[in-house]
From Swiss-Prot:
GO BP terms: DNA-templated transcription
Gene it is expressed from: rpoA
The protein, known as: DNA-directed RNA polymerase subunit alpha
Keywords from the named record: DNA-directed RNA polymerase, Nucleotidyltransferase, Transcription, Transferase
EC numbers, comma separated: 2.7.7.6
GO molecular function, one term: DNA binding
Organism of origin: Mycoplasmopsis synoviae (strain 53) (Mycoplasma synoviae)
Catalytic activity entry: RNA(n) + a ribonucleoside 5'-triphosphate = RNA(n+1) + diphosphate
Functional description taken from the UniProt entry: DNA-dependent RNA polymerase catalyzes the transcription of DNA into RNA using the four ribonucleoside triphosphates as substrates.
GO cellular component terms, A-Z: cytoplasm; DNA-directed RNA polymerase complex
CDD domains (UniProt xref): RNAP_alpha_NTD (cd06928)
Keyword Transferase: yes
Region (Alpha N-terminal domain (alpha-NTD)): 1-251
């Protein structure tokens, strides 16, 4: 077997990072031709959909039965408060949080005026921390009028509020035992578990005058507070290696950290990636969502010629969608 060129890699700050340690570029040199895109696509998919994180799945507010309401002496309505809570970034230690464990955060605000994420307190789990403590949640004109609890769990990818409603029904007894509030509904929220905000890549050819052309891969990665790009890349590589070990050497694999047991629910196939993870423009995402297209598979099965019939989907958006389908090998000729 002919040996491959030894590759070199390093991780450097992104050009526009402005000293942001959560935005980095992984550079890999000396790749055989074609390996740049091969590695980039695999790493990007793992980074966006398979890195574990922690996120809220529901909120309970004293005296509130649904999100389309308002509280006296509180400037913001409930929808706005929920939107603000989604901006709170949390970090946790996997060794201290069990699978399907429900974590509770309570809002402790005995003053009026501006209430922020600094007023949130974790009540039942060690090593869970609020990373951005300056997120504005609500403005009160009277102390103590907003009593709130936020419930979180660990997971991967994205879970919409409809699926979280089912989870709330399953865990209703446990939630009521955890809650300290006397009344109020458990209001479901979308959960964005992935700590990875964005992944982009660029492949350039090196020594093009030579008979043996090599490639350089630049993978730009941005993560949320508390999870460094380096740790996210390390975990993504670990997941990929475990899969390749399974295929190539079944006898020497210790895969308990990566794979679920056969009794556990299987994750959605990668082809059923949520539309929001494709990095389409917000206009394209909204238009597709209103047409009932939620996954990559559903988009791929939709006739290209019928895209023009989708409301608010212009020519540029259609071109963007076609490029994205081609990128994932889903474009039908």
């Amino acid at each position: 077997m002919e040996k491959l060129t030894k590759i070199k890699h390093r991780i450097i700050p992104a050009k526009d990072s402005q000293n942001n340690s959560y935005k980095k570029v992984l550079k890999i040199k000396g790749l055989e031709r074609g390996f740049g895109n091969t590695l980039a696509v695999a790493l990007r998919r793992i980074l966006l959909s398979n890195i574990t994180g922690i996120a809220p799945f529901c909120v309970r507010i004293e005296g509130v039965e649904h999100e389309f309401t308002a509280l006296e002496k509180v400037s913001e309505d409930i929808v706005t408060i929920l939107s603000n809570l989604k901006k709170v970034v949390l970090n946790y230690d996997e060794d201290y949080v069990k699978d399907n464990q429900i974590i509770k955060l309570s809002l402790n605000a005995n003053e009026d005026n501006r209430i922020t994420s600094n007023h949130l307190t974790v009540t039942n789990a060690p090593r869970v921390e609020v990373q951005n403590k300056d997120v504005e949640i609500a403005t009160l004109s009277k102390p103590g009028v907003l009593k709130l609890e936020m419930f979180l769990r660990a997971g991967r990818g994205y879970v919409d509020f409809e699926d979280n409603k089912k989870f709330i029904e399953e865990k209703e007894k446990e939630l009521k035992e955890l809650s300290s509030l006397s009344k109020g509904a458990f209001i479901a929220m979308d959960s964005v578990f992935s700590p990875v905000v964005n992944v982009a890549w660029k492949v350039t050819e090196l020594n093009t005058a030579s008979l043996k052309i090599e490639e350089q891969l630049e993978l730009e990665l941005e993560t949320k507070l508390g999870v460094t790009p380096e740790s996210a890349i390390k975990l993504a590589c670990k997941i990929l290696v475990a899969h390749f070990q399974t295929i190539g050497d079944l006898t020497d694999l210790d895969s308990d950290e990566i794979f679920q047991s056969e009794k556990q629910s299987l994750e959605k196939e990668e082809d059923d990636m949520e539309i929001r993870l494709l990095n389409l423009s917000m206009r394209s995402q909204n238009a597709l969502a209103k047409s009932g297209i939620k996954t990559l598979n559903e988009l791929a099965s939709y006739p290209i010629e019928k895209l023009k019939e989708i409301k608010n989907l212009g020519e540029k958006s259609r071109e963007e969608i076609i490029r994205k389908l081609n990128e994932y090998g889903k474009l039908k000729n």
